[in-house]
Amino acid sequence: MPSENAPRAKLTTIASFPRQYFLENMAMRGDNSILVTVANHRELWYIPPPIAKVPVDPLFLCTFAQSAMGIVEVEPNIFYICTSNLWTSHESYLHRLDLRDWSPGKSINPEVVLKFTEPVRGLNGSCLIASNIILIADCFANLIWRVDLPRDGGKATARVWLKHDSMAYDPDGPMPDQPGVNGVKFATKTNYLYYTSTTKQLFMRVRIDPNSHEPAGEPEFVAGGRMADDFCIDENAGVAYLTTHRQNTIDRVSLDPSENRDFGRHSVAGKPFTEQLIGPTTGAWGRGPGEYGRVAYFLTDGGTKSPPPNGIARPATVVRVEFTASP
C-alpha cells in the first residue's frame, strides 16, 4: 500500500465545544446527526445534521454519574452507552437509549441495563459484532468484555471475552492515564475484530468465529509505531484511519498485516500540524449516499490531554474529513 496512493483529506469544522471538553466517542445516526459522549464532563450531546450550513450548534442531552465512554447503535435509533468511574471506584454501567420517538428539544431517559462486576476497571470503545452482542474494551483491566443483549430490550449480561498482553496499560509508566486496549471495530466481511492498544502503540486484530462469536485464534499484530486511540475502517479499500490523539494526526494503515511490513507511517491529516485537528479521538463514516469510504466525521479534544505547542488548549471540535484521490 504505497503512500503515494493514499488520499488527500479536506477538513471542515462542523461544531465546536468549550475548551477542556474531552469528546470521547460518537455514533452516526441515519440522518447524519451525531451523538457525542464527553468523558470528563460525563455528558451526552447531539449534533444536528451538517447539511444546510456549518458550523452547527451542539445540543446538550444529559449527564451521567460516571464518565461517558463508548456508544453503539444496535438497531435503528436504539443505542447503548457505557459509563465508568475510571479512577477510583471503577463503577461501570451500560445504558440503553431509545430515540425512536425522539426529536430535538425533547428530554431523553437512558435506562441502566447492566452493572458490571469484577474485574471491570474502565470501559472504553465498543462495537456490535452480532445483532445482540456488543464487545467493549476495558482499557485498565486489559481485556474486552462480551455483552449479550436480550431480544426484548431488558437486562443484559456480561463476561470477559478476551484478555491478552497486547491490551495492557502501564500504571507505573510516564503516562499512567494512558489507556491500554481502547478502540474496537468489527470488519463484517472478514470476521475480524480490530483494536488499538494505546500504551503499547499497537493496532491488532483477532478473528471471530461466526457461529459462537468467540475469538478464533490468538490476536495478530497489524501495525504499530503510533499512539492510536480509535479508528474507522473502510472494508472496501482494506484500510483503517487511526486517530492518534496526543500526536494530532489521522493515520492510514492497511487492514492486512503483510501490507504494513515495509510501509512507513502515513498521516493523511495533521502533518504538518493544523489547528483543526488537535487531539483527535475517534472517527466514523457519514451515512449519506456514497459517503462510506469518502466522508468521515472525527472528534477532537482540543488539546485537553496534550496541549498544542503554545500550551493553550483550543475548543474541542467535530470535524468533517473528505477523502479525495491523490492526483
Give the role of each language-model region.
Residues A9-F17, K53-C62, N109-F116, A158-M175, ...:
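A short beta-strand motif characteristic of beta-propeller blades
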Residues R8-K10, T88-I133, A137, A141-L143, ...:
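Asp-box/WD-like beta-propeller blade repeats and closely related beta-sheet repeat scaffolds
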Residues A284-P327:
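Blade-level signature of beta-propeller repeat domains, shared across WD40, Kelch, NHL, RCC1
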Residues F17-D31, T63-T88, K115-I133, D165-Y192, ...:
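Beta-rich, blade/repeat-based domains predominating
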Residues I47-A52, L97-G105, V147-K155, R205-E214, ...:
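Short loop/turn segments immediately following beta-strands, especially the blade-tip
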Residues L35-T37, Y80-T83, I136-A137, Y195, ...:
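Residue position within the beta-strands of beta-propeller blades
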Residues H41-E43, N85-S89, A141-L143, K200-L202, ...:
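Short glycine/acidic-enriched loop and turn motifs that connect beta-strands
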Residues Y194, K200, F221-S267:
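Loop/turn-rich, solvent-exposed surfaces of beta-rich toroidal or solenoidal domains
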